[in-house]
A protein has these predicted regions:
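Domain-level recognition of soluble alpha/beta enzyme cores
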Residues: 11-13, 150-179
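Glycine-rich phosphate-binding loop signature in dinucleotide/nucleotide-binding domains
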Residues: 37-38, 123-131
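Signature for phosphate-centric chemistry
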Residues: 69-85
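Short, acidic/turn-prone active-site loops that include or flank metal/cofactor-
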Residues: 68-73, 160-164
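Active-site-proximal alpha-helix that buttresses catalytic centers in soluble enzyme cores
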Residues: 1-69, 86-96, 100, 104-117, ...
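Beta-strand elements within well-structured catalytic alpha/beta cores of enzymes
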Residues: 44-45, 127, 131-140, 144
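Short, well-ordered alpha-helical microsegments
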Residues: 51-53, 142-145
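A polyampholytic, Gly/Pro-enriched intrinsically disordered region
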Residues: 83-98, 176-192
Length: 192
């Protein structure tokens, strides 16, 4: 089902399921991204196929740590039978509804924020130990995680949280706010 077709709520629910099960397209990752993370000993990913496939494409020889901790913030299709929209419009409606408390059998916004609070220390520890932490995950959860990292003394130095393939966001510890324990150098945490 394409993103440009007008669909109802049931078709959007199927679209979500299909997207969650999908892998990645054959396009290789951008060379500048591959070079940015080349020295990483491991890559963190969600347990979804597209995240794992992307992680392997980026760092084929690094240790892969796949965990539901980094899974995308969930979407559910609101039952609006009279409405037909394109999938991206449905995604906006579903996300707004989710923020408003619509969570039929899925993780709530508050639970996603809590998961981000659990995920941030994993990346911070990796960055402090190895000088880099690489996460290949999903746009909306990455944005929630980014807010959590900023609250913990990290700052975004490049990129923006966008819903695009191979989107890259780089964080460094903001030494003016929270110097690294026993270190003065910044540590980068690319969040895919």
């Amino acid at each position: 089902m394409g993103r440009s077709r007008w669909i109802g709520h049931a078709a959007f629910a199927r679209f979500i399921d299909d997207y969650q099960a999908a892998g990645i397209e054959a396009d290789p990752p951008p060379q500048e991204l591959v070079e940015l993370i080349a020295d990483a000993p491991r890559v963190f990913a969600s347990e979804l196929k597209r995240s794992i496939d992307s992680a392997r494409a980026l760092l084929p020889y690094a240790e892969l740590v796949s965990t539901p901790l980094f899974t995308e913030a969930p979407l559910a299709s609101p039952r609006l039978p009279a409405l037909r929209m394109k999938a991206p419009a449905w995604a906006v409606v579903a996300r707004v509804a989710w923020h408003g408390g619509f969570k039929p059998g899925i993780e709530s916004y508050g639970q996603s924020k809590q998961r981000a609070r659990q995920a941030a220390p994993v990346l911070i520890e990796e960055a402090e130990q190895n000088g880099i932490a690489v996460l290949v995950a999903h746009g909306y959860f990455n944005a929630i995680l980014g807010r959590t990292l900023r609250r913990r003394g990290w700052r975004r130095v490049s990129g923006a949280h966008r819903a695009r393939f191979w989107n890259t966001v780089v964080y460094e510890r903001d030494t003016a706010i929270a110097p690294p324990p026993g270190r003065s150098a910044t540590r980068r945490v690319p969040a895919g």
